[in-house]
Curated annotation (Swiss-Prot):
Main location: membrane
GO molecular function, one term: ATP binding
NCBIfam families in alphabetical order: 3a0107s01c2
Pfam families: ABC_tran
Catalytic activities: phosphate(out) + ATP + H2O = ADP + 2 phosphate(in) + H(+)
Source organism per UniProt: Methanosphaera stadtmanae (strain ATCC 43021 / DSM 3091 / JCM 11832 / MCB-3)
Keywords from the named record: ATP-binding, Cell membrane, Membrane, Nucleotide-binding, Phosphate transport, Translocase, Transport
Name of the protein this chain belongs to: Phosphate import ATP-binding protein PstB
The EC number(s) this enzyme carries: 7.3.2.1
Membrane topology value: Peripheral membrane protein
Family under the similarity heading: Belongs to the ABC transporter superfamily. Phosphate importer (TC 3.A.1.7) family.
Lineage: Archaea, Methanobacteriati, Methanobacteriota, Methanomada group, Methanobacteria
Gene3D superfamilies: P-loop containing nucleotide triphosphate hydrolases (3.40.50.300)
């Protein structure tokens, strides 16, 4: 992988004494989509949350090893975690719009990070909603509550809110699991558009989704990466028997 933006070296994570991730070594390529697959409880969401230090919010969490973003360890003591999470945004499994207007949902992060120029905020809100393929559906109701949007629209709003603060990387934790098939297609189309400008790491239980949106896939099992590589190779010609068993439905 020639153009890596994230390097993970000898990563072990623990909740109390429970070793959740075991000796993870992997890279994430810039401006690509990497899918994380594996059965429930295999560690893929825990891994995703190490990439912007969301696990730090859990008191019993600790880690060993390094995660380098653009060559710098994100767990160094001098790292500003707020700035890190601006650079590495997160879209959660369940859409979580704020109980505010559609406009204020997207503007919120900009204001939190100190932007006071309302003309600039307005331009970024519009640009972000367009990038999230939502503008045409909401342009005449920006002052309405975001809670009135459909589930699929709310998830795209959360994506717009994430990209408004200009992240380098977008993490997605099963972003389509609560959506109907039509909304899922819209989010997948959006992912394929966003990868031109962002690096995306997506956790999914939907293996067909992994084949549709990702360039690379990592298969997790019992806290380890069993196999990682080009998505076509993983699904069409897996090197590991455990990978083959999982993607053919023999377990998981």
């Amino acid at each position: 992988m020639s153009n890596k933006v994230i390097e993970v070296k000898n990563l072990n994570t623990y909740f109390d004494d429970h070793n959740v991730l075991k000796n993870i070594n992997t890279d994430i390529e810039k401006n690509s989509v990497t899918a994380l697959i594996g059965p429930s409880g295999c560690g893929k969401s825990t891994f995703l949350r190490t990439l912007n230090r969301m696990n730090d919010l859990i008191p019993i969490f600790r880690k060993e090893g390094q995660i380098l973003l653009d060559g710098k360890d994100i767990y160094d003591n001098n790292v500003d975690v707020v700035e890190l999470r601006k650079k590495v945004g997160m879209v959660f499994q369940k859409a979580n719009p704020f109980p505010k207007s559609i406009y204020d949902n997207v503007a919120y992060g900009l204001r939190i990070h100190g932007e006071k120029d309302e003309d600039k905020i307005e331009k970024i809100v519009k640009k972000s909603l367009k990038a999230a393929a939502l503008w045409d559906e909401v342009e005449d109701k920006l002052d309405k509550s975001a809670l009135g949007l459909s589930g699929g629209q709310q998830q795209r709003l959360c994506i717009a809110r994430t990209i408004a603060v200009s992240p380098e990387i977008i993490l997605m934790d099963e972003p389509c699991s609560a959506l109907d098939p039509i909304s899922t297609i819209k989010v997948e189309d959006l992912i394929n558009q966003l990868k031109k400008d962002y690096t995306i790491v997506i956790v999914t239980h939907n293996m067909q989704q992994a084949t549709r949106v990702s360039k690379y896939t990592s298969f997790f099992l019992n806290g380890e990466i069993i196999e990682t590589g080009n998505t076509d190779d993983i699904f069409l010609n897996p090197k590991n028997k455990q990978t083959e068993n999982y993607i053919t439905g023999r377990f998981g």
